[in-house]
Amino acid sequence: MRFTKMEALGNDFVVLDGIRQRLHLTPETIRTLADRRRGVGCDQLLIAEPPAHIAADVRYRIFNADGTEVEHCGNGVRCLARFLVDEGLAAPGVLRIETDGRITEAEPRDDGQVSVDMGPPELEPARIPFQAPVRQEAYRLATSRGEQTIGAVSMGNPHAVLRVDDMTGAPVAELGPEIERHPRFPRRVNVGFMEVCTRDRIRLRVFERGVGETPACGTGACAAVVAGRLRDWLDAPVTVELTGGVLVIHWLGPGRSVWMTGPARTVFRGEIELPASAAATPRGPTR
């Protein structure tokens, strides 16, 4: 099976073409592909497929390294947009990418950056999903380290955002996995630890659901800026400094789309031998 290895700010992906071929992948196969010793190695696996929605150019699916499917990935959608153009699967320009019932617009640029309309954030607790009686700008969450104040935001996937004084010393390893599986988040949650440096710059670490801490998380950066803007800590746009690099996030307020701009690049292409049950077969015309 042919694959493309890509990265965005150190968040790495195995990308598969499911447009020209049908892929038959089990969770076990996905875990093997993601394994850095037995497979290719990645934080997440991305599959490009023919769209189900007539308004979309392509559909993509996202799988964590543990084999679970998730709703959205900001760094992943930038890599996918770059992959589609580089592989000749889409013409340069604005691409309409379908995932989990929503369509995201992405535009690969000549300078290596990709701008993405991530859509408006979801703030209603039931739709995040998060267990709370009413919508608030901040919530109190009981943890083993005492009550924590969080922002709860969905960017197509759920995020909890905590403000910390110093990103470097943030309790990511301790609170990340605990909050990820907190019972008030029924589908688990990504956890961001945000240091506000100025009104237009933050530093951020993210413990990703089903993955652990990663060098960067695009939806996490969007969620952090939304949470910070709702608390009047930030202006627009905001430069987000992550371990893997920098994203620029622009959000003008409730009901408006969040725009994310950042890099995406191909690292290498290759082939891997997989069990016969995971074989790819040619796909006929889709439209």
From Swiss-Prot:
The record marks 268 as: Important for dimerization. It is an enzyme of class 5 (isomerase). One of its GO terms (molecular function) is diaminopimelate epimerase activity. Keywords: Amino-acid biosynthesis, Cytoplasm, Isomerase, Lysine biosynthesis. It catalyses: (2S,6S)-2,6-diaminopimelate = meso-2,6-diaminopimelate. One of its GO terms (cellular component) is cytosol. InterPro entries: DAP_epimerase_AS, DAP_epimerase_DapF. Belongs to the diaminopimelate epimerase family. Catalyzes the stereoinversion of LL-2,6-diaminopimelate (L,L-DAP) to meso-diaminopimelate (meso-DAP), a precursor of L-lysine and an essential component of the bacterial peptidoglycan. This is Diaminopimelate epimerase.
